[in-house]
């Protein structure tokens, strides 16, 4: 029986490793900005949080007393994810693969709720105050050429103006 459990554990570990990814710092910054449309003014803070929470590893799991933290953003099983969903309506296992779309969606939700409660959504992450509340620009150093960042900011401004205009006409 113990041999079967050991084999099962090994096989499940290999499967997780096949679906997991460890990002490079700039790779994550570019993906958050370009694919997931992270706000430019928050990008360095998000990258800092990921570095200190998971070391850019999508399969990271941190064990806590009653629960555990999962994925890049180390999202808590107590409040946000669970086998049946929880507040982010997501299983914790789905936060441990190489597709960070659901991780980002949940992280944004956590940020928004904590922003409403505490005035700073980043305080939901324990690493924020000691590591990421000051100047975090070093986390983006060498990741973008200046024109691509300015182009993304301009696109964000144009999109925001378009959304405001659409809301006025609705």
Per-region residue spans from a language model:
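Poly-acidic low-complexity segments
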Residues: 2, 56-59, 91, 99
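Export/targeting segments at the very N-terminus of extracytoplasmic proteins
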Residues: 2-57
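Short secondary-structure capping micro-motifs at structural edges
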Residues: 33-36, 60-63, 92
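Catalytic and binding regions of secreted/periplasmic enzymes and modules that target cell-wall glycans
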Residues: 63-170
